[in-house]
Amino acid sequence: MLYLGVIGYPIKHSVSPAMHNAALQHEGIEGIYLAFEVKPDRLRDAVFGAKALGFRGLNVTIPFKESVVEFVELEGEAAKIKTVNTIDLVEMVGYNTDVYGVKAALSGTELGGKTALVVGAGGAGKAAALALLDMGSTVIVANRTEEKGREAVEMLRRYGECIFWPLSRVEELKGKVDVVVNATPLGMRGFKAEIPVPPSMLDGVELVFDTVYNPMETPLIREAKKRGCKVVYGIEMLVHQGAKAFEIWTGIEPDVGVMREAALRALRF
């Protein structure tokens, strides 16, 4: 029996169990994927408790993607941005499949030479920024707290052209960016139903990508559509990062279509 799970706080919004359980069933693997709400002061207990119980792997979501790095060895992109969203509990290795998820979600868009604004400098923000740098974009990271934003940029600038911009002055970038990415929880079910930038900033922007997937139609996505921007839904990043995590745990490339359909079904309820 294969035991997998996701830890976060809050976690009720997660559709990862529906998505991964559908993949397990489709591949004929006897296993189960469960969601666990973990209080911030119990992270270590949760990780090592899952290992002790024989879990093969965990996904890690808000607010643990950065704090969990102290418990695992870092591999690939996780080592570059000190952010983990997938753990192999047998080897105690942390991976970042969010970077892969962002690249797959944005694969239909030519991003070389574009200027992208990433709002948020946490785990999702650093993953989105690294993906965009790898795809040839210049990246501006805007964050509410300057120290955290500058720390992220210091980490990212060795992989491409990346600068910090205070979120309080983000309106000054109007007309200067081609892509806007929300990598904050704003708009997520259970968080404030707001958008991370002034609506007028979206005028003339080519592409808007919201990493939030629940609800699918976030306030930012709705505003971007109204203003004629191409939009990419967070569900695409979710599905592709999940597929890569599944492959790490099982050695099998799952059917992305099966995972997407299961995630969409779960979002409707």
Swiss-Prot record:
Record bears the keyword Amino-acid biosynthesis: yes
Residues binding NADP(+): 120-124, 143-148, 211, 234
Entry EC no(s): 1.1.1.25
Annotated keywords: Amino-acid biosynthesis, Aromatic amino acid biosynthesis, NADP, Oxidoreductase
GO BP: any one term: chorismate biosynthetic process
Catalytic site: 65
Reaction catalyzed: shikimate + NADP(+) = 3-dehydroshikimate + NADPH + H(+)
Gene3D superfamilies documented for this protein: Leucine Dehydrogenase, chain A, domain 1 (3.40.50.10860), NAD(P)-binding Rossmann-like Domain (3.40.50.720)
Positions of shikimate binding: 14-16, 61, 85, 98, 213
Pathway: Metabolic intermediate biosynthesis; chorismate biosynthesis; chorismate from D-erythrose 4-phosphate and phosphoenolpyruvate: step 4/7
Its biological purpose: Involved in the biosynthesis of the chorismate, which leads to the biosynthesis of aromatic amino acids. Catalyzes the reversible NADPH linked reduction of 3-dehydroshikimate (DHSA) to yield shikimate (SA).
UniProt similarity note: Belongs to the shikimate dehydrogenase family.
Oligomeric form and interacting partners: Homodimer.
This protein's name: Shikimate dehydrogenase (NADP(+))
Organism: Archaeoglobus fulgidus (strain ATCC 49558 / DSM 4304 / JCM 9628 / NBRC 100126 / VC-16)
Native organism taxonomy: Archaea, Methanobacteriati, Methanobacteriota, Archaeoglobi, Archaeoglobales
Gene that this sequence comes from: aroE
